[in-house]
């Protein structure tokens, strides 16, 4: 359902050989911050690279597995600038929204994040999210993954 023309799936062989261990370390750290200790195994289900260009976006969606993540490899300079929207508190060009529940008193349902190169964001697979388009020339390159968590019995 993506409005992005260039997504490349990374082979399981490459993933296992070069990326899986590092991602497992990052996921273990994320899980330990949540005080979860009975992890038996973390399996990276899949990983793909997304090349997003001017005007492209990824509509609201969620993932499979238990945890998902996005890492930012390249961002166009000035990606979040938008000359058409002066005096706006929230500028969404090229940003990512995480969406959960409904807006309620003292509770926001949308968390907007302005990515930076080298950011790695890990989140529950069911958390709805969207990547907004940007209106300048350049490439936003990221990778996304899904992971399954196996617990000790």
Feature map (PLM): residue ranges:
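Non-heme Fe(II)/2-oxoglutarate
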Residues: 1-38, 48, 55-58
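Ligand-binding loop in jelly-roll beta-barrel domains
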Residues: 128-142
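Short catalytic/ligand-binding loop motif for oxyanion handling, primarily in non-cytosolic enzymes
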Residues: 58-59, 130-131, 152
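Catalytic core of non-heme Fe(II) oxygenases with the double-stranded beta-helix
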Residues: 45-122, 139
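Double-stranded beta-helix
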Residues: 146-153
């Amino acid at each position: 359902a993506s409005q992005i023309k260039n997504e490349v799936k990374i082979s399981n062989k490459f993933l296992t050989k070069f990326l899986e261990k590092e991602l497992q370390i990052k996921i273990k750290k994320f899980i330990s911050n949540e005080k979860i200790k009975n992890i038996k195994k973390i399996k990276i289900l899949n990983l793909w690279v997304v090349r997003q260009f001017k005007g492209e976006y990824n509509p609201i969606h969620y993932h499979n597995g238990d945890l998902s993540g996005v890492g930012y490899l390249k961002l166009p300079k000035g990606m979040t600038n938008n000359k058409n929207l002066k005096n706006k508190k929230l500028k969404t060009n090229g940003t990512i929204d995480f969406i959960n529940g409904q807006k309620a008193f003292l509770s926001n349902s949308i968390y907007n994040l302005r990515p930076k190169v080298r950011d790695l964001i890990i989140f529950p697979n069911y958390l709805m999210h969207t990547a907004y388009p940007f209106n300048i020339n350049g490439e936003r390159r990221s990778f996304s993954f899904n992971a399954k968590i196996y617990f000790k019995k």
